[in-house]
Each structure stands twice: as C-alpha cells, then as structure tokens.
C-alpha cells in the first residue's frame, strides 16, 4: 500500500516536469530554422555591411532575437549569427543569394494626393498630365523588380495619397534602410526648354557613391544623361541613410514626355535602377 502511494506521489511530481520539458522542446523546435548558404549569407551583425561568418552549405539555427528586421541566430548551439528576417521566411523566393536580397530599400514616389507636382499640358483638348502619376508608376515598377530579387522594399506611398516631405526620410531612418531613392520628373520655366535625366545627392560619401553608381546605368536611356549633381532637397538632405533623388526627364517638354508616359521607358529605367542598386549593395556588403 505504501509503495503504491509513493509511486503515485512520484508520478504526480514527474508529470509537471515532463510537461515543462515537452513545452521547452516544442518552443525550441518552433524557433529553429534551416539556413541554406545558396540563399542566405550569415553575417556578424544586423545588416549587409557586416562581415560574413563561415558557414556550411546547410546550417541549423535557433532564433534568439531580432533587430532592424534581422534575426539573431544561435548556430549549432554555440555561434551567433544574423540573417535578414524576410529571407528566412521564404528562402525559395529567390534561387540564389544576391546583394539585393539582404537590402532594405525605401522608394519615394514624389508628390501625391493634393500635391500633383509638375504637369504636361496637351494643347489639343487641354488635359493635364501630372507628375505624381508617373512617379508612382515608376516607383511601383522598381519595387516589383526589387522584390523579385529578394529585397525588402518600403514605399513612402503606394497610391495617390498626400505624404508630407519630413516623414519620407524618417521612414529610411526608422527602418535602417540601405538605400533611399526618390523619383521625380523635372520641369523648366517654359515648356520644351529642358531635356534629360539628372541624379541628385546631398551628402558626400555613400550618398554620392550611390548617385554615381545608379546614374551610370542611365547612359543608354533615350533621354540624355545629364549626370549627377548636388541637390538641396529635403528628402535627401534630412536623411541619415544613403539617399538620392532621380529626375527622370522633363515632364513639360514634349520630347521627354513622349518617353516618360510609356511603359517601355518606365521599364527600362526600372531595370537600370535595379542594376545600379545591386552594384551599390555589392560594393557596400561586408567581405
């Protein structure tokens, strides 16, 4: 009788312990993830500028923290590494690793809502074509192509809404973006006076390097590449991250607008931008 009572007590003590161990095991397994080197480079810190760590073709890690949309991982129970959270969630989205798949990019479609920006006027029926329409169309194309490369893309606006200037660079600062790029279309005092594309930077260093790298890709556009220039624009001036503003043609010049309005031109610009951003991120990536 006493032996039966003791066994019952023992089981009453062991059951909570076993349940706790099962819960710990389940939580641990839930936070474990397999990392494929072909898809993700593990780094020493939360960003693509940190040096990579040595890794096997396949690693098993446990998520132990998060910073700037990067997961902190414990690899093989001893080594600490970092990886972009958005890539860990779907490693099959991009076949192989590339610099853009580690990058956070803020895309700013200039103007919007009650702020229409510059305009092109068609004198035949006197309709007006607004800058805000074409900056958004271009921004969406660039965003789509960047996401296809695995990049984390944040848009300051994704519809025809008004967004004040000051919050736009704040989005880049808050997300620790690797790149901030703002799209606009230029305008001259008189119609048909100006033509061409210009890339502006405000800060020297990474921002100027970004301007040079992206602008170099515009040499084969149907509009003349006017090069890079210093520009005192709030969205790039009040920006803590690498930031540029691209004027992709004069909207009030008929020759330029005939390009600006076409899907072909927008697609060509988007391809050039993605190529330039990939090159910039490759140059910035920790070695």
Task: Write out the residue ranges for each language-model feature.
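Active-site histidine-acidic residue metal-binding/catalytic motifs
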Residues: 92-169, 175, 189
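Intrinsically disordered, low-complexity Ser/Thr-rich linker and spacer segments
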Residues: 30-32, 36, 44-45, 86-103, ...
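Active-site-adjacent substrate-binding region
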Residues: 206-229
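A short, glycine/acidic-enriched catalytic loop
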Residues: 116-129, 188-213
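Hydrophobic membrane-insertion alpha-helices, especially the h-region
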Residues: 10-28
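Active-site-adjacent mobile loop/cap segments within catalytic or ligand-binding domains
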Residues: 182, 200, 229-287
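SH3/SH3-like beta-barrel superfamily modules
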Residues: 51-87
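Solvent-exposed loop/turn segments at secondary-structure junctions
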Residues: 111-114, 159-163, 185-190, 204-207, ...
């Amino acid at each position: 009788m006493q032996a039966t009572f003791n066994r019952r007590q023992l089981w009453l003590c062991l059951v909570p312990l076993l349940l706790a161990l099962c819960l710990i095991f389940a939580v641990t397994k839930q936070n474990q993830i397999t990392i494929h080197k072909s898809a993700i480079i593990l780094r020493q810190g939360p960003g693509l500028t940190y040096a990579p760590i040595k890794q096997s073709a396949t690693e098993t890690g446990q998520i132990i923290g998060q910073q700037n949309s990067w997961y902190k991982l414990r690899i093989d129970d001893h080594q600490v590494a970092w990886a972009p959270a958005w890539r860990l969630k779907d490693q099959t989205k991009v076949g192989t690793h590339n610099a853009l798949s580690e990058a956070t990019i803020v895309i700013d479609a200039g103007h919007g809502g009650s702020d229409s920006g510059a305009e092109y006027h068609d004198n035949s029926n006197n309709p007006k074509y607004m800058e805000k329409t074409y900056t958004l169309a271009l921004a969406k194309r660039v965003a789509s192509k960047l996401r296809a490369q695995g990049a984390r893309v944040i848009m300051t606006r994704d519809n025809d809404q008004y967004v004040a200037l000051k919050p736009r660079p704040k989005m880049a600062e808050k997300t620790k973006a690797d790149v901030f790029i703002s799209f606009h279309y230029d305008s001259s005092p008189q119609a048909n006076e100006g033509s061409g594309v210009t890339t502006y930077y405000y800060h020297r260093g990474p921002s100027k390097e970004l301007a040079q790298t992206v602008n170099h890709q515009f040499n084969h556009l149907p509009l003349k590449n006017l090069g890079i220039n210093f520009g005192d624009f709030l969205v790039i001036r009040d920006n803590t991250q690498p930031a540029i503003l691209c004027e992709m043609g004069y909207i009030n010049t008929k020759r330029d607008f005939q390009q600006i309005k076409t899907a072909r031109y927008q697609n060509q610009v988007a391809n050039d931008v993605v190529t330039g951003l990939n090159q910039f991120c490759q140059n910035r990536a920790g070695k």
